Amino acid sequence: MCGRFSLTTEEQQLNEFFRLAGGTEPYVPRYNGAPTQNLAVITAMEPHRIQYFRWGLVPFWSKEFPRSTPVINARAESLNEKPMFRQAFRKRRCLIPADGFYEWTRSEKKQPFRFVMTGETPFAMAGLWDEWSHEPGKHIYSFAIITTSPNKLMEPIHNRMPVILLKENYDEWLSGDNEYNLSEMLRPFPDNGMKVYKVSDRVNSVNSDGPELIRPLVNQDLFSNE
């Protein structure tokens, strides 16, 4: 599962990394991106600009806007089986820029951890997007993050992780049409390319935001609750 992530990279560095010419809205760093928020994505429609879509996929065929828990993740193993994801996987894929994501231990006291690249560079999670417009004058663009089995770094903390794409696959992920090649991209990211550290439990609240959320705790004994 992936239920919270950050994008705090300076705008110039972000534009250079993803070969962007800007965004549809002013760029604002997000230290605690959460479901139902409008967050940065890159699509084949605008491959050189950031767009802002709602996190929680609403399929185009839905007769009404869902009021229940948003669908924030899509399992890589069943994209072609689930009606909610099948067409989006074939035609509406996206990159979700990030520089870290959060996950919590499954113990009684839930300790948040932040996962980043070893070089603390930006990266792209694999996503699906859709457009819902069943109410007059109302168009909602939304997305979900694709998840896969965990790598060795992630496994002690959670049994799923977001699909992190290799940079050389970004263009094909957005506009490719070979389903075998696309499916092969949906693998756990190499654990030696990532690192993890404890962060404050302030990140537990979706209302919290700010640079203090991504600072490492002093105690980095990873599996101590103290």
Give residue ranges: language-model regions.
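Short linear sequence motif anchored by a di-proline
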Residues: M1-E226
